[in-house]
Amino acid sequence: MMVEFAPLNTPLARCLQTAAVLQWVLSFLLLVQVCIGIMVMLVLYNYWFLYIPYLVWFYYDWRTPEQGGRRWNWVQSWPVWKYFKEYFPICLVKTQDLDPGHNYIFGFHPHGIFVPGAFGNFCTKYSDFKKLFPGFTSYLHVAKIWFCFPLFREYLMSNGPVSVSKESLSHVLSKDGGGNVSIIVLGGAKEALEAHPGTFTLCIRQRKGFVKMALTHGASLVPVFSFGENDLYKQINNPKGSWLRTIQDAMYDSMGVALPLIYARGIFQHYFGIMPYRKLIYTVVGRPIPVQQTLNPTSEQIEELHQTYLEELKKLFNEHKGKYGIPEHETLVFK
């Protein structure tokens, strides 16, 4: 089969969109290694006047990702994020108003690959978040390990993400006056191994820590489903029990890292590459579940609220799936 390349007269806007998403994908795949390499080179070539002050700062600043982070508005306002959002494009949908006098936990589903819906909607100034939810500040919680890499952590925090640790969640949810939203991708990295186009498998049955945090702080729970998130990449088939899945599960269990073998389109052609497909992403924010603050919740209370959350998440999916091209017979699978 002959590979057809993109025409030379491709509109400039589409070229800029492709470039924006390419840098974002490469930041996931390579930026950590580049940042580590820079630090190693500074040490090897004895640029002590650069690396020693930074390492002192690194030590001093270690807990910042657990204390609200350090977002920079000018970074969140970079034009690159406008083109990033338009590539798919990414849309935020509100189903109900939220009270800015309260704090909330948004449970984001599914994880998919690279989670562009969560980043595009909650970490850039080009999102409709502020328009749809005035008076709110969003905090996207990501794995703590991302903040362990020098230099990379500064770039990551500048876009708004914070740690997903208990301390970080408590810091956000205990802020007086309300108007704070903690966004947690509840399926975690392991759910990326389930991210096949047209599938809706969520790793959530054993994820109950967020429920305990909601009860402890009296934060309302809000299910969020991002339609189209799993359709951006294809993944080499990895059913449970296969040699590939066995290796992937072993890597996750030992290192906490999930490595799905993915492919989609290329930069200049549509047949194969690391670029995600241009698929619409509709991130739908559901109805809030009121939570009464309980400083020492029992396991029964946690289980009851967890079950309520699963039911509301399933309702959200079923109510909106038809609008976004999902057949009526499809349903969520909880693992």
Curated annotation (Swiss-Prot):
Residue ranges annotated as transmembrane are 24-44, 104-124
Pathway(s) per entry: Glycerolipid metabolism; triacylglycerol biosynthesis
EC number assigned by the record: 2.3.1.22
Superkingdom assignment: Eukaryota
Mind telling me which PANTHER family this protein's record contains? 2-ACYLGLYCEROL O-ACYLTRANSFERASE 1 (PTHR12317:SF26), DIACYLGLYCEROL O-ACYLTRANSFERASE (PTHR12317)
What coarse category fits the chief subcellular location reported for this protein? endoplasmic reticulum
| Stored InterPro entries | DAGAT
Localization annotation? Endoplasmic reticulum membrane
Describe tissue expression.
Expressed at high level in kidney and stomach. Expressed at lower level in brown and white adipose tissue, uterus and liver. Not detected in small intestine.
MF terms from GO for this chain are: 2-acylglycerol O-acyltransferase activity; diacylglycerol O-acyltransferase activity
Specify the protein name. 2-acylglycerol O-acyltransferase 1
Keyword Transmembrane helix present in the record's keywords: the answer is yes
Q: Which reaction does it catalyse?
A: a 2-acylglycerol + an acyl-CoA = a 1,2-diacylglycerol + CoA; 2-(9Z-octadecenoyl)-glycerol + butanoyl-CoA = 1-butanoyl-2-(9Z-octadecenoyl)-glycerol + CoA; 2-(9Z-octadecenoyl)-glycerol + octanoyl-CoA = 1-octanoyl-2-(9Z-octadecenoyl)-glycerol + CoA; 2-(9Z-octadecenoyl)-glycerol + dodecanoyl-CoA = 1-dodecanoyl-2-(9Z-octadecenoyl)-glycerol + CoA
Membrane topology per the record?
A: Multi-pass membrane protein
**Keywords linked to the UniProt accession:** Acyltransferase, Endoplasmic reticulum, Glycerol metabolism, Glycoprotein, Lipid biosynthesis, Lipid metabolism, Membrane, Transferase, Transmembrane, Transmembrane helix
Q: Name one GO biological process term.
A: diacylglycerol biosynthetic process
Group of enzyme by EC: transferase
Provide the coiled-coil residue spans: none
Q: Which family does it belong to?
A: Belongs to the diacylglycerol acyltransferase family.
**Can you name a GO cellular component term?**
endoplasmic reticulum membrane
Which of this chain's residues carry glycans?
N180
Q: What does this protein do?
A: Involved in glycerolipid synthesis and lipid metabolism. Catalyzes the formation of diacylglycerol, the precursor of triacylglycerol, by transferring the acyl chain of a fatty acyl-CoA to a monoacylglycerol, mainly at the sn-1 or sn-3 positions. It uses both sn-2-monoacylglycerol (2-acylglycerol) and sn-1-monoacylglycerol (1-acyl-sn-glycerol) equally well as substrates, and uses sn-3-monoacylglycerol (3-acyl-sn-glycerol) with lower efficiency. Probably not involved in absorption of dietary fat in the small intestine.
